[in-house]
Amino acid sequence: MRGILGLVFGSVILIYLISLFLMKHPFFQIREIKVSGLYVEEIEKIEKDIHALGRGLLVIPESNILELFNEKLNNRFQGVEINKRFSTEGITIEMNFQRRKAISFVNINEKKFLMDMEGIFFWDEYQKPDKTLFIYSKEVFQFFKQKILKLLTQGNSVKVYKDKVMVDIGGKRFILPPLEDINEKEIHLMKKLLKLHPDAKIFDIRYKGFILLNEG
């Protein structure tokens, strides 16, 4: 029995020593970490976190690493790709960050965000989209997200109130019913009115049966 225990114990020590040797071998050492898709200021903010991860970059799932850096940099990354190259000189790790593409500013109760085409909020000081959404509640946005995104494709500015929605298109303003009453008919009507009344500045289409025009 002692012989078996001694054999097992000796095997464990041998495996441990081999592991230590391998971990110290240059082939298993991180020689270089290359980062792309970031600005210099961003790299400075997360440099310590990258070094702290160390060999964890070899095994930690990309989704977990993405979550970590999105917490640091306001959810601005859509993805991160991590490639590893092994050589006798050591391991080279390449981290390629993919940024979310902002389609609009979002103002909610005086708080400002950016939004991508999937309706995800984030912040990225390096992006300046030409559209703006004003809305009074995140919950309202989530409930009517697809409808709001469709309205944003039509205009430069969308303002959502409880009793109406205003859409600005190239210097012209459309006043629409509340979000819950808007459907494809209103969107098609906006396109039609732009062609029929090119000189009008304001189109009020909240009321069934008639449309108010302001020629300005």
Swiss-Prot record:
GO cellular component: membrane
Spans through the membrane: 5-22
Compartments (UniProt record): Membrane
Membrane topology term: Single-pass membrane protein
Principal subcellular localisation of the protein: membrane
Origin: domain of life: Bacteria
Keywords: Membrane, Transmembrane, Transmembrane helix
Annotated protein name in UniProt: Uncharacterized protein aq_522
